[in-house]
Amino acid sequence: MNNSNNLDYFTLYIIFSIAFMLITLLVILIAKPSTGLGEVLVTINLLNALVWLAINLVNRLRERLVNHRDQQ
């Protein structure tokens, strides 16, 4: 099995996670309470969690398909 795709997805997730953490830090440091950036921050963190979930589900399905194919 070629693990380069898994590494690419994991690297992409790490890059997005770091970017979301930096955006979160900037929002916390710069935002004023009345600007509504809190909702943006919550949305960004939710998207980060959904991306993580999607990547993990795709990788698990791919591993199951490869294992099933190898057993035949």
Swiss-Prot record:
Periplasmic side: 31-34
Self-association state and partner proteins as the record states: Interacts with FtsL, FtsQ, FtsI, FtsN, and probably many other cell division proteins.
Transmembrane parts of this sequence: 10-30, 35-55
Gene expressing this chain: ymgF
Mode of membrane association: Multi-pass membrane protein
Organism ancestry: Bacteria, Pseudomonadati, Pseudomonadota, Gammaproteobacteria, Enterobacterales
Predominant localisation class: membrane
UniProt name for this protein: Inner membrane protein YmgF
Cytoplasmic side: 1-9, 56-72
Source organism superkingdom: Bacteria
Keywords tagged on the record: Cell cycle, Cell division, Cell inner membrane, Cell membrane, Membrane, Transmembrane, Transmembrane helix
Function of the protein: Could be involved in cell division. May participate in the stabilization of the cell divisome under specific conditions.
UniProt GO BP: cell division
Protein's cellular compartments: Cell inner membrane
Annotated GO CC locations: division septum; plasma membrane
